[in-house]
Amino acid sequence: PDRREIMVVNLHFDWVEDDKFRFQQAKELAKYLDTLTLPYVLMGDFNDQPQSRTLDLLSRGTMAAVKPRQDRFTFPSMKPTIEIDFIFAAPREDWQLNFSRVLNGKVTSDHRPFLAVVELQP
């Protein structure tokens, strides 16, 4: 099939109550992402929630791998109460989300794993 190159970017943003540093990290990353000529997948522990300015900035122009509403929380793994792990693909029109879910199994991290199957469109 199609053998197009993509860029995969994994991140783990800082966790502090005040989001100033995290947002600064996001602005620097956004500058880098804007230079890419390849389609990309951005994923990781954003340590921020969906309505944050960090997520607003980094999700612009992307296809978000949306989690099932009833099972979207990823942290803490034993009894998750917040959604801070995300997967985005850009540019939006190049990608299709085929499947997504938060996995609930043997605990190997303080976060539950988030799985998404995204397909690069021809």
Tell where the protein language model's regions lie, with residue ranges.
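Beta-strand-turn-beta hairpins that frame and shape the catalytic cleft
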Residues: 1-11, 118-122
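Metal-dependent phosphoester-hydrolase catalytic domains
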Residues: 19-21, 27, 31-41, 46-122
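Surface-exposed cleft-lining segments at the edges of enzyme active sites
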Residues: 11-19
